[in-house]
């Protein structure tokens, strides 16, 4: 942890979803990409081989469609339809969602909430999909708002939007901290100029995350709570 950094001292916290709050033990979101592309464009396209961890749904779609030979102009024109279809697909299959909470995440969120902290989701998921995951995991009531992919595409844009929303509620001087599980979360937080806590509950190890110099790095929420102020 950076010397002098009190991880729970910020006014608001932006939490990534996948790998930070929960890990999905289902393929609903995964198949929604393929099925939505097939429905809208009539082509078979897989997300296999496309980096997904730390990416955004729009970023993943763009990479898949570029690989299939589409130009950005064509992608941009069809994205709204594909996004709508993806959300509808996950909505239809919401009962199959099987999120597994990361260690001590409820206790961590409650620790912050009882101290009056404003909590937000800040995720590369499409908004409908992100909220459905949190709802199925039982976490939805803990978050005041969220910032998601589409029309935003870059993770830094998603974080900046979340910061803006937090400061609209709390005032322009409100302090905000990001909590995530990937190097992309760390890098995006640096771009927007806020502290970042990395938790190694996704695919990246503690050492891999620590190499990107977050303000604090922990193996899981249990360890984070041990350093609560």
Label every PLM stretch briefly.
Residues 2-53, 59:
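Active-site neighborhood of HAD-like aspartate-dependent phosphohydrolases
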Residues 20, 105-135, 148-153:
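Substrate-recognition element of Asp-dependent hydrolases with the DxDx(T/V) motif
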Residues 71, 140-144, 215:
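Conserved H-loop
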Residues 178-219:
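Acidic, Mg2+-coordinating phosphoryl-transfer loop and its flanking beta/alpha structural elements
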Residues 48-49, 53, 76-80, 140-154:
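A short, structured active-site edge motif that brings together acidic residues
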Residues 65-111, 115:
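Metal-dependent phosphoesterase signature
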Residues 156-187:
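Conserved Lys-Pro-Asp/Glu-containing loop-to-beta segment of HAD-superfamily phosphomonoesterases
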Residues 58-73, 133, 162-165:
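Helix-loop "lid/cap" segments that line or gate small-molecule binding pockets
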């Amino acid at each position: 942890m950076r010397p002098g950094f009190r991880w729970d001292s910020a006014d608001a916290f932006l939490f990534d979803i996948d790998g930070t709050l929960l890990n999905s033990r289902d393929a609903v979101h995964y198949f929604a990409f393929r099925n939505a592309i097939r429905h809208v464009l009539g082509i078979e396209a897989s997300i296999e081989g496309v980096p997904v961890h730390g990416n955004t749904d729009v970023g993943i779609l763009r990479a898949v469609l570029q690989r299939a030979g589409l130009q950005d102009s064509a992608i941009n024109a069809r994205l709204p339809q594909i996004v709508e279809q993806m959300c509808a697909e996950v909505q239809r299959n919401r009962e199959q969602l099987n999120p597994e909470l990361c260690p001590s995440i409820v206790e961590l969120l409650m620790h912050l909430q009882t101290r009056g902290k404003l909590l937000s989701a800040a995720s590369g998921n499409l908004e409908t999909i992100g909220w459905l995951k949190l709802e199925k995991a039982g976490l939805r009531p803990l978050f005041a708002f969220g910032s998601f992919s589409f029309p935003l595409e870059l993770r830094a844009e998603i974080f900046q939007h979340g910061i803006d929303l937090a400061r609209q509620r709390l005032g322009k001087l409100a302090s905000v901290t990001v909590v995530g599980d990937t190097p992309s979360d760390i890098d995006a937080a640096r771009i927007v100029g806020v502290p970042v806590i990395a938790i190694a509950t996704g695919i990246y190890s503690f050492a891999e995350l620590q190499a990107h110099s977050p303000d604090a790095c922990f193996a899981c929420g249990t360890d984070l709570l041990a350093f609560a102020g």
